[in-house]
Amino acid sequence: MNIAPLVVRDEILLENLVLVDGQGGCGKTLFTAIVTAMDRVELLNYSPELENICALNYLGKIEDDAAQAMIRIQMDLVLYETMMSRRTNFRPADLSSVFRDVDFLTYVKRLFSKGDEVVPERIKEEKPILHFATHNLLAYSEPIHKALGKKVVLIEVVRHPLYMLIQQTLNQINHFESPGTARQFNIFIKHKDKQLPYLNFGQEELYLRSNPVERAIYEMQKISDLTESFKDKFKGSYGRQILTIPFERFVLDPWLYMRRIGDFLATKMTSKTRKVMKKQNVPRGRISDGIPLDIYKRCGWEPPEKELNEQQELVKRRQFAIEQGASKKAMSVLDRMCHDYEEKYLSTVSGLKRSAM
């Protein structure tokens, strides 16, 4: 009987990788725009391949050695092609479009520069920081850390659950029911005759008997719990490569976090970074004072009501859950998540606790 070989990729082109990770509606779009504008950071990319490898490993469908080798190959391939603009997105309206990048001309020049054999040496000289936005990845990211070691930094963006609830409810309606599932390039699992997002492994029956807003609440809870467990378990191993940033604190006073991002990535802010921050309205007077991007509107964003304070904005979002038919049990879960988040991240921020409820 043949013994299965160990799968490896010993050589690696990748110098540094930054993953901006978080749940739907947490504010990744804002963060990726700002991080991209820092020195040496590459144009924003998305990697369902990376997310799916980690998901399959979590589900026991891919062995550790295979997952780690695939991650090293995939990251090297993306970097290699990015350095020749083979992966550059020229669709003007896309968030990952080169037209939204502060170094637009860099990617145009790469189209006409020498590639292939000269790319590895250019990577060594320029030390580019590969940059991805990822979704709900931190809890399942052990294969990434094992594959890439200190080359990877993961920025976890967290946000008040009530500010993420509308988008995640819309996702349950638009993405996880036919025909929306055809545009979702992530792993699903089979339960009875239904397919479910793999994030609901272990709570399949709860998912199936819940309505969209309840599914959003229970999924949010599970991801949050798994993520906190991962951080606790691997604090000693990977803690220096994980930077958790509360959205609310960042948009009100970003400077400490910007310095920490620079330290984690061994890079720095530039005048272009400050220009992008101003465009994103950071810092801002109120948390809800976002900018009216089309992507935000499609995800349920509405401009804040001027007469409402921060606490009243939270009350309005909680009412959304009730109006969408959330059960008492689901509301209890939501309220507990909100309380825990407020105590952990917002206890010293004036006006951001729902004490009036």
Regions found by a protein language model. Give the residues of each.
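A short acidic, amphipathic alpha-helical/loop segment
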Residues: L30, Y140-A147
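Conserved phosphate-donor/acceptor-positioning beta-strand/loop module used by diverse small-molecule
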Residues: A133-H135, L148-L170
